[in-house]
């Protein structure tokens, strides 16, 4: 089932320097909660400055949903320490609140009013809040409080030059973009390994079902927790953050121009369902528009091709201008065993897997095959640890044992690990392979199995509160290592100044501005 990458691996072993200079970055979301686990109703902590313009700490959907962002980094340890500093400073500056350590929220009552993230009075700030108003009216606020970790990854120019020859200009844009689309297609075909190993949301609180019927065969504990005994990541299931109306958009990952055209079409395609919501009611705007996507970011995807945007530029226009610059992996649940929601083992595994995805052949993929890859993902998400579970290839009928496919994949990853260790020194990547391959013979070692044991004992709420309390105490006491207190104070002041400048510069009424920008 795994493509034959022996030739590509032999090529890599002859060109190890092609992997010198991998760049990566992390984003981690987390809900601010009170000591009893309920959602904080306070505004964004003052010490964190402006959520609109702060370089490292912002908010996602809700005012209580923090998002931490590391700068691009070539050093894994430095990146994780930077992320830990962001958590340390925040933990010391959020009063008695703490950070929820799980992807799935708990203690949010049905119909509870969840305050949308607020970004001030500039047109850009108001637009961001309006977009969130649209998300709330389309999908419900509860779904938007699910948190995850995003891992951003780019291969060095040396890799592309070793693989594609001496490239520059338009040629480089085309070939590098084609290379990243290969990564994306392989990710859709084999990325289910991420929730298998690191999925950490095998259960949900009963409030999450909001009284709606479900066809999933949930088991229920006395405290009202619903779980599937072999599930890995309900966050990635249809109960979590997915968008049914997007499933027939037909966006594919074979070609830059085709992909962008599909995306641009989706933001212009009217939706009957969303038209029923209306655009305005009693003078209050309800969504940006009633199209399938309000803006490009609404496209739900487990992985995205990205380029840093310039001021006023849409993500797709940035891709058209310069091609794909990096990949954003979006399938990671919060790691409940780490105070910062992600750890070194995961980052090293993702490095290995992304390199493998760049090496393995990836035939073009139609939108129907893309839909078929979802079958494997759903199996792993809902019953990934089930003994004897099998997976298919695309829309074909042949089935292969997950256990064997996983081991075959790790046989290749071990060779990538040897190459990465040879240029970085030590054996850190090979150790990660040895630790994780054991999860196929013993699924009890996976994150989902480990966290489910705790959840069955103490419930999601009890588990979440215990971890949140322990991490709060730990982070508050740890000294900063990379950033200093004065760096945070300076960024707070600079971010507030930037927001103020934006608000002062805006003279156009929001309605007029909105018309021009949508």
Swiss-Prot record:
InterPro entries: Gln_synth/guanido_kin_cat_dom (IPR014746), Glu_cys_ligase (IPR007370), Glut_cys_ligase (IPR006334). Its EC number is 6.3.2.2. It comes from the Bacteria. Pathway: Sulfur metabolism; glutathione biosynthesis; glutathione from L-cysteine and L-glutamate: step 1/2. It is an enzyme of class 6 (ligase). GO terms for cellular component: cytosol. GO terms for molecular function: ATP binding; glutamate-cysteine ligase activity; metal ion binding. The keyword Nucleotide-binding applies. The keyword Secreted does not apply. Keywords: ATP-binding, Glutathione biosynthesis, Ligase, Nucleotide-binding. Pfam families: Glu_cys_ligase. NCBIfam families: glu_cys_ligase. This is Glutamate--cysteine ligase. The lineage of its organism: Bacteria, Pseudomonadati, Pseudomonadota, Gammaproteobacteria, Enterobacterales.
